[in-house]
A protein has these predicted regions:
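Metal-centered catalytic cores of metalloenzymes
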Residues: 19-79, 83-153
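Positively charged n-region of N-terminal signal peptides that target proteins for export
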Residues: 1-5
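Bacterial N-terminal signal peptides
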Residues: 9-19
Length: 153
């Protein structure tokens, strides 16, 4: 009987650790971004303006993205999630978001996706960003990187 008690005490920390890892893997992680004008030259000043914010919540491999924008000089057309090779550099589109216009200059964006393991890693490393396009700026009007936020306990 005494042997079983020692065996149980030896495996108790392992059981606790496995349970803790399983619980922490499902804790939501929050990412936020500030939408600001894409890099522009003098000729683009008449067409590119605005600001906004975006939040992404990752639970397991599912991400839910929501955001708002305003101050555009023409109506929004599309919003996309792009993957950048490094933060601050444009990259290819990987996901399409829904855009709802409140009026000609403002609106919301949203989407919910099941990410691949590579996309989750890219999100956690700050390689994913949102790009919002508009009628007068079809190559992008606003953009913002999704950066991890610390969970306050």
């Amino acid at each position: 009987m005494r042997h079983h008690t020692w065996l149980w005490l030896a495996f108790l920390p392992l059981v606790w650790l496995v349970g803790f890892v399983a619980l922490s893997a499902q804790q939501p992680k929050t990412f936020k971004g500030r939408l600001s004008p894409v890099p522009i030259d003098f000729a683009m000043q008449a067409t590119i303006a605005g600001s906004g914010s975006v939040t992404a919540v990752l639970t397991g491999s599912k991400v839910t993205i929501s955001g708002t924008f305003d101050g555009l000089k023409s109506p929004a057309t599309i919003a996309q999630v792009h993957k950048s090779p490094v933060r601050g550099v444009r990259g290819p589109n990987v996901l399409d978001l829904a855009v709802t216009k409140t009026d000609a200059a403002s609106g919301t964006l949203s989407g919910s996706f099941d990410l691949t393991a590579i996309q989750v890693a890219d999100l956690e490393k700050g390689r994913l960003y949102i790009q919002l396009h508009s009628e007068k700026a079809p190559d992008g009007n606003l953009w913002g990187w999704l950066l991890p936020q610390e969970n306050k306990r």
